[in-house]
């Protein structure tokens, strides 16, 4: 039986996300899922092949409905072999398509993270103190709004190694200063551009909606500016602090499926993400506009 209990002591998908861009022999991509299949259903089915330590099903950010695919992490790699040895897998009346999760080739282990939902009132010293508890920090970037010359509601933290990033990603949200912040791996802008080029060939993604009223109070202002920044460049950052993945084209969360026809499952919903085009990193080394912009994914 699985060790994946009803109330796990980690966030769903956190153990899967902790090793993004790295080959993990116990990790699988599961395609062709019925919209009615739940995480529990998928976990129970795959548990017959070995102990499942993490499982996540991706959902549409607008409707909350399953997008028909997910990821699973087995405790032992031999379980993956057992799954693949079985010619046919049927769950909730549908043939499902399990595959090894293949990490994108040529990508270095992540050392830089994006911190979203950060109050501009949080001092640099507070940021150093919190993130320094996970490992040695190489650099902290605090983007400024070029129009107001005020801090934006997010920052970037670069470590000297990859281990601190793994530790951070074990939890999706972190309490930093007075707010609850979301942590994501920062991705080079050129990678995002490549994804956008692929997306344009397959059609446009979800429409960009505009957020609520334009409040000017400092308490709401920074948070709203952060949400607007996401709406325009990255995706939807809900009022409840949750971020919903927007979609992917031939690659997902650091995994390469370029030879796989996701269109048959209706997965190709496009990427929308943060590009950093409006920000200058006053704290970045060298000053001025930061040439190697990053965005989370």
From Swiss-Prot:
Keywords: Cytoplasm, DNA-binding, Methylation, Nucleus, Repeat, RNA-binding, Transcription, Transcription regulation. Residues 26-108, 111-190 form the RRM domain. Residues 202-222 have a biased composition (Gly residues). It is found in: Nucleus; Cytoplasm. PROSITE patterns: RRM. Its main location: nucleus. Signal peptide: none annotated. CDD domains: RRM1_hnRPDL (cd12758), RRM2_hnRPDL (cd12585). One of its GO terms (molecular function) is DNA binding. Residues 1-21, 192-224 are annotated as: Disordered. One of its GO terms (cellular component) is cytoplasm. Acts as a transcriptional regulator. Binds DNA and RNA. This is Heterogeneous nuclear ribonucleoprotein D-like. The lineage of its organism: Eukaryota, Metazoa, Chordata, Craniata, Vertebrata.
């Amino acid at each position: 039986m699985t060790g994946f209990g009803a109330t796990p002591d980690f966030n769903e998908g956190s153990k899967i996300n902790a090793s993004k861009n790295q080959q993990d022999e116990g990790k699988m991509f599961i395609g062709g899922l019925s919209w009615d299949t739940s995480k529990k259903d998928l976990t129970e089915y795959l548990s017959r092949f070995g102990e499942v330590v993490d499982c996540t099903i991706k959902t549409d950010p607008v409707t909350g409905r399953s997008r028909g695919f997910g990821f699973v992490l087995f405790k032992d790699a031999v379980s993956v072999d057992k799954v693949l040895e079985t010619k046919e897998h049927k769950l909730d009346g549908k043939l499902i398509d399990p595959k090894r999760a293949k990490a994108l080739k040529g990508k270095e282990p992540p050392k830089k993270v994006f911190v979203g939902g950060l109050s501009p009132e949080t001092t640099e010293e507070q940021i150093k103190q919190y993130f320094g508890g996970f490992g040695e920090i190489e650099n902290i970037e605090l983007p400024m709004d070029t129009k107001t010359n005020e801090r934006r509601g997010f920052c970037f933290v670069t470590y000297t190694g990859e281990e601190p990033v793994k530790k951070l990603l074990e939890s999706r949200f972190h309490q930093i200063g007075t707010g609850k912040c979301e942590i994501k791996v920062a991705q080079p802008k050129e990678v995002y551009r490549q994804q956008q080029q692929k997306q344009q060939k397959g059609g446009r993604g979800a429409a960009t909606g505009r957020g609520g009223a334009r409040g000017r109070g400092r308490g709401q202002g920074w948070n709203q500016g952060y949400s607007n920044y996401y709406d325009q460049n990255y995706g939807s950052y809900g009022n409840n602090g949750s971020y919903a993945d927007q979609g992917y084209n031939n690659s997902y969360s650091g995994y390469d499926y370029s030879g796989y026809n996701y269109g048959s499952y209706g997965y190709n919903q496009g990427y929308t993400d943060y590009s950093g085009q409006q920000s200058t990193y006053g704290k970045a080394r060298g000053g001025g506009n930061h040439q190697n912009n990053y965005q989370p994914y």
